[in-house]
Amino acid sequence: DENFNFSGQGSDKYSQQFDGNIKFKCFPNWPSEVSEKSEYVSLYPNVMLGIHIDHFYAFWLEPISNNQTKEHFELYYIGDESASSDEFKGIREKNFAFWQEVMNEDVTAIEGMQNGRNSPAYNGGNFSPVMDTPTLMFHKWVATNLTK
């Protein structure tokens, strides 16, 4: 629907982080039968939210110039103990390192695509109807808002 300002995808493969016997507290009403599900929602034009049984994050992009973007990333945990106690410091660091690695996996590809867009041979790119539905929805959102 072109009236929506978001898109996203889910996963059935989320695994809680452990540090020895320590694991983050979970959302109290999260059903156990969907404990491995997670959702990743993009709010247009520049915010991505990720929610899991034991934490969530906000990731947003700040355009600095036509060729530079600053990334912001914040993790949030359930309850004061998971969020700030010394007992959970190690697992918070482990979780941050995990998400940092996941986000960094895309940097080379994204920078390469942006560099390619400067080429006169660039044709706009090819999208997969299976994997790129959120990108298509974003393009429709941009086109709709540019014509208002």
Model-derived segments and their meaning:
Residues 1-148:
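C-terminal catalytic domain of Rieske-type non-heme iron oxygenases
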